[in-house]
Amino acid sequence: MSSGIILLIVAIVLLVIIAYLVGVIIRKRNDTLITSLEERKQALFGLPVNDEIEEVKSLHLIGQSQTSFREWNQKWVDLTLNTFTDIEKHIFEAEHLNDTFNFIRAKHEINSVESQLNLVEEDITAIREALGILKEQEEKNSARVTHALDLYEKLQASVAENEDNFGSTMAEIEKQMKNIEAEFSQFVALNSSGDPVEAAEVLDKAEEHTIALGQITEQIPAIVAKLEDDFPDQLDDLETGYRRLLEENYHFPEKNIEARFQEIRESIRANSSELVTLDLDRARDENTHIQERIDSLYELFEREIAAYKVVAKNSKILPRYLAHAKHNNEQLKHEIARLSRKYILSENEGLNIKAFDKDLKDIEDNVLEIAEAFDQQEKPFSELQLILDRSIKTLASVESGQMDVFAAVKDIEKIESQARQHLEIYVTQLHMIKRYMEKRNLPGIPQDFLSTFFTTSSQLEALMDELSRGRINIEAVSRLSEVATAAIANLEELTYQVVQHATLTEQLLQYSNRYRSFEAGVQNSFEHALKLFEVDNDYQASFDEISYALETVEPGVTERFVNSYEKTRERIRF
């Protein structure tokens, strides 16, 4: 055998070995893929889809939800009965082809199975998602229905528990509840017939009506309590109190109180009847109006009761107060009569006393009897209170006026005594001023001083004449005394001024001698001032003339002389 043949045989053997090894490797890889596909198929088949289907089925779906569920359930049945069986068959075929080294067809089967598994996985995911959505929707719907039914059941329980608190509205409430029950029945019928949209609308309306009726029933008991308990109790209390007050001789400014009681009761009945319409705003407004009318009656009675207490108190005060004022008036009249014999009094005192008499007589004639028998009067105590209050205020005004008159007349004699004392002092002062001026040895007395002196003397004489009358006019005495006081003070001040100007002028005229010989201005002022001093007796003008001239040549000289004079000035000795 030639070497070429040997090499060919070896090559063929090697190729066979290599081909076998390659086949073994491919077969092993395909076995791995087939095993993986089998495991994947088992994992998909092992998903809890059946449990989820049974869970959704237990929800007893209806309508569109039930149709959707049936479609997805059928799809799962198709997958389990057909698709998984077909996949199993293709896996078995792939194993057989792989075992027989038919790798190309085996690979085709493996790819086919993988594609089918991908589709199955997508379908299962879609089925599970759809089941989850159906379950979630049904749970939401069930929760809504449960919530609405719970609201209604609570409303039923509340109404049943508080049935006695709804009064005339109970029939209307029961009617509204039957309407809500009908809406729930309509919801069930529509939902069962596969019309979820309209069923949801009906459920919404039923829930809204339940909530609204619940709110109404929460508010009604308070309104009914007012109409059936509070108002009747208050009216009974008012009527009982009214009868008791009448027995105690109370009278009222209004004569239709019984009619007002009846009108309020009719309003209560009318509002109770209207309440069946469940118009709560109107019912509350009417209740407020009724309460205001009841309150006005309470205020009326309380006002009269309070007035009675005030009248009872003032009825004791007024007689004593009147007697006190009359006593004061008598004393004042006696005092004025006594003083009138000696003095001419102001007409005001007499007029005031007459006015006081008139006020006191009016109270005595018209009010005193009322105060002493106030509980026998046929007038409301509030009116009696006004009468007594006015009278007591009048008495207070009279008393204040009496005090003013007393203050005016009590000092009359003192005014006369003081006026006489002052007159005596002023006459003495007038003489002392005259002597003071005479001792000054002036060239003459200024005319303005003489005028003031004689005016003051006349005023003192007028006061003296008034005090010498048989009946003294005390007002004139007071006025003249004030005038005399001011006149004496003015005369005293003028006296000091005249003497000061005269004395200082003499001193300055003498002092000016040191400048006259060489100051023409001083010489001229000297001559003019001397004339004013000796001829005209105008001492102030003379002082002004010479002091001005000296100030021009020796500033401050006048102030020096004035200061020196004030330190040594002689005072009038009164």
From Swiss-Prot:
Membrane-crossing residue ranges in chain numbering: 8-26
Membrane topology value: Single-pass membrane protein
GO process terms (BP): division septum assembly; septin ring assembly
Subcellular location: Cell membrane
Chain ranges on the Extracellular side, renumbered to this chain: 1-7
Cytoplasmic side stretches: 27-574
Keywords linked to the UniProt accession: Cell cycle, Cell division, Cell membrane, Coiled coil, Membrane, Septation, Transmembrane, Transmembrane helix
Coiled coil: 102-131, 161-190, 276-379, 459-493
GO cellular component, one term: plasma membrane
NCBIfam families recorded: PRK04778.1-1 (NF003407), PRK04778.1-4 (NF003410)
HAMAP family according to UniProt: EzrA
Family: Belongs to the EzrA family.
Reported function: Negative regulator of FtsZ ring formation; modulates the frequency and position of FtsZ ring formation. Inhibits FtsZ ring formation at polar sites. Interacts either with FtsZ or with one of its binding partners to promote depolymerization.
Protein name, UniProt field: Septation ring formation regulator EzrA
Organism this protein belongs to: Streptococcus equi subsp. equi (strain 4047)
Species lineage: Bacteria, Bacillati, Bacillota, Bacilli, Lactobacillales
